[in-house]
């Protein structure tokens, strides 16, 4: 059974947790660069995300529900909401059941230590044969996605 965990930000990731093999495959959130009003912008690539999901027997997806943070600008909040919408739309197109989960819920359930390093450390503990996926500080999106998928598998 494949459970998908998604950290939906532009520096997030998508994790495919195989509950039988107890392994995880992680891909960085697919993004594309485009120019709007003369400025370079990045957004989630719906087509590439769909390609990553295609052909897999996915049982369910768990998507991190993140709210706007104090101090974020309107453009930033809109951009994040657009990313969430793209991800939810692609999952819906593949008829994959989606559960939204707060960071607090999944972090507590997987016994994650606080902070981004805590996420990477916990992912390396749970998936030691794939620890190289979570080695770098910037791999926190990967570790979050993997832990969200693990959380999803444990709560089904």
Per-range role (PLM):
Residues 1-156:
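Phosphate- and other anionic-substrate recognition elements at nucleic-acid/protein interfaces
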């Amino acid at each position: 059974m494949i459970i998908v965990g998604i950290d939906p930000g532009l520096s997030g990731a998508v994790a495919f947790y195989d509950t039988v093999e107890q392994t995880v495959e992680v891909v960085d959130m697919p993004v594309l660069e485009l120019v709007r009003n003369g400025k370079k912008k990045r957004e989630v690539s719906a087509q590439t995300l769909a390609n990553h999901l295609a052909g897999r027997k996915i049982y369910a997806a768990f998507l991190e529900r993140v709210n706007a943070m104090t101090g974020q600008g309107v453009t930033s909040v809109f951009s994040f909401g657009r990313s969430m919408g793209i991800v939810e739309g692609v999952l819906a197109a593949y008829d994959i059941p989606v559960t939204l989960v707060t960071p607090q819920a999944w972090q507590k359930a997987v016994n994650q230590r606080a902070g981004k390093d805590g996420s990477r450390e916990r992912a390396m503990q749970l998936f030691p044969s794939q620890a190289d996926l979570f080695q770098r500080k910037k791999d926190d999106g990967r570790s979050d996605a993997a832990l969200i998928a693990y959380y999803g598998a444990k709560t089904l």
